[in-house]
Every structure is written in C-alpha cells, then in structure tokens.
Amino acid sequence: MIRTENLCKIYHLINNNANISRARLAGITNLSKTTVSSLVDELIRGGYVVDCGTEARAHQGRRPNALQVDGDSNVVAVISWRRARLDLALVSSDGRVAFRDRLPLNEQSDGTDRVADAFFRRLLPAAGGARVMGVCIIIPGIVNEEQRSIYSTVIGVDPGDPVIERLSEALARY
C-alpha cells in the first residue's frame, strides 16, 4: 500500500514538473535515491514515464536524466454528453488533446447506447496503440450516488433512469 502511494506521488510529481530528475524527486519526497530510482524504473517499465536523457545545465558535474510522463502512449477518453450531441476527445496523460470529434444526437436515440458506441467505435480506434488509462463521461446534472441515478439533467434522461449503472454495464467489457 505504501509503495502504491509512493508510485502515485512520484507519477504526479513527474506529471507536474516536466524534466524533473530522480535526485530532485528524492529531495521533494524525502525518499532515498534508491527507492525513487526503483519507483521510477517501475513507472518506466509500465509505460507511464519516459527517461528523456540528460538535461542541459549551466554548472559542471554529472547531469541528471530528465523524466516526463509518456503522453504519446497514454490517453484518457472523454465524452461530454450534451442535449443534442456528444463531444468526444482523447486527452494525453501530459495534457494534450490528441483527438476531438462531435456526434449528433437525436431525441429518439438512447444516449447511453450512443455513448458506448462512441467509445468503442470512435475513441478506441482513434487511440491507436496508446493505452486508454480511463474514461471520463461528463453528464450535466445532479447525481444521486447511492441510487446511481440522476436527479435532474438537461440531456433528456428521465429521473430514476439508472443511467450510471447502464453506462457501467455498457463499458464493462473494456
């Protein structure tokens, strides 16, 4: 559990501090250089981080290797469900929008089915060889977490419709 927390901490520090070195990570986290190197190596092997080689420095001495998140290999699928359309995007782990598209919705279509269809038929193919690290579905409305339903929304979902459960089931095979 502690190792997982430290992995997350190291990943977030690399994500927020492009070209950071292992030594700097050790200084910020108060972890040993050996521990930091082990954690960074695990993130590199997992394909989440890349070692960009030595960074340019003004002073002499050994130049540390710069680390960055691997935005080319990792994306998050984002679907924003609007009244008349779905806005689709793939956002790389380093914050770049790698793909963007729009799909119209008509009043007769089941939005839940369209969301799942957009994910499997548009976003996954657009991701190519990149790993889809997660799916973010934006639904404008008030969510009842206990019942996994929506109280109020502008997208035409009836109150009490278990849309969250239906989306979970529709995307479960991923």
List each language-model region with its residue ranges.
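Glycine-rich phosphate-binding loop and adjoining helix at the ATP-binding site
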Residues: D101-Y174
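N-terminal helix-turn-helix
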Residues: N19-D51
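Extreme N-terminal segment that seeds HTH/winged-HTH DNA-binding domains in transcriptional regulators
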Residues: M1-R22, A26-G27
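Electropositive phosphate-/nucleotide-binding environments in soluble metabolic enzymes
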Residues: M1-C8, K33-S37, D113, V157, ...
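Gly/Thr-rich phosphate-binding beta-strand-loop-beta motif of the actin/hexokinase/Hsp70
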Residues: G61-R100
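Short, cationic-aromatic polyanion-contact patches
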Residues: M1-N6, S21, T54-S73
